[in-house]
Regions:
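All-alpha prenyltransferase/terpene-synthase fold signal
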Residues: 1-193
Length: 193
């Protein structure tokens, strides 16, 4: 039941993401709803199933589900930020993949919302151009990184990831100290490091 519900939510999230494709003018709340329905739902289901299989109480299962949800959001936000940086090569993701595919991520949403008319026009054109191929990808990507840095969008995305990583760790507070709790905390810290 947990996994089938998660699969339905993930499918809904995929549809929401496809509907937001090319549209940098979505709210941060709408973007967070998309990643809650995609990445966070998967992480939450995995953590919930782990609790069920371990025979945890309902309260403990809810705490694990909250841990997974917040960890999933943190993970996705870090992934969003890494798309515009060089560290991601270590993680096996090529820089600019999301940008090349026209995926609107939180850094783009924040930069668009904070940008002036020129910045917003850039994001509208660049996101559409990534889909239809009518662009100079390298020049657009360099400009995108500049806009993200100028508006503080990357730093704020990482700050939000850290916030959700901390919320994930906080969800584990009801569990007594143990090796498993320590490992889950370390996983959250690794995600946002």
């Amino acid at each position: 039941d947990v996994l089938s519900n998660a699969a339905a939510v993930i499918a809904e999230g995929e549809v929401m993401q496809l509907a937001a494709m090319r549209n940098a003018d979505i709210s941060e709340d709408n973007y967070l709803r998309i990643i809650e329905a995609k990445t966070a739902a998967l992480f939450a289901a995995a953590a919930e199933v782990g609790g069920i299989l371990a025979g945890a109480s309902e309260t403990e299962i809810e705490a694990l589900k909250s841990y997974g949800k917040n960890l999933g959001i943190a993970f996705q936000l870090v992934d969003d930020a890494l798309d515009y940086g060089s560290v991601n090569r270590v993680l096996g993701k090529n820089t600019g993949e999301d940008f090349r595919e026209g995926k609107v991520t939180l850094p783009v949403v924040l930069s668009y919302r904070r940008g002036d008319q020129t910045g917003r026009a850039f994001w509208e054109r660049a996101m559409s151009a990534q889909i239809d191929g009518s662009n100079d990808y390298e020049a657009d990507f360099e400009m995108a990184v500049q806009y993200l840095q100028t508006t503080g969008a990357l730093q704020d995305t990482v700050a939000r990831a850290t916030h959700f990583g901390e919320r994930a760790k906080d969800a584990l507070a009801l569990f007594p100290p143990s090796d498993m709790r320590t490992l889950l905390i370390q996983l959250s810290e690794f995600c946002i490091a």
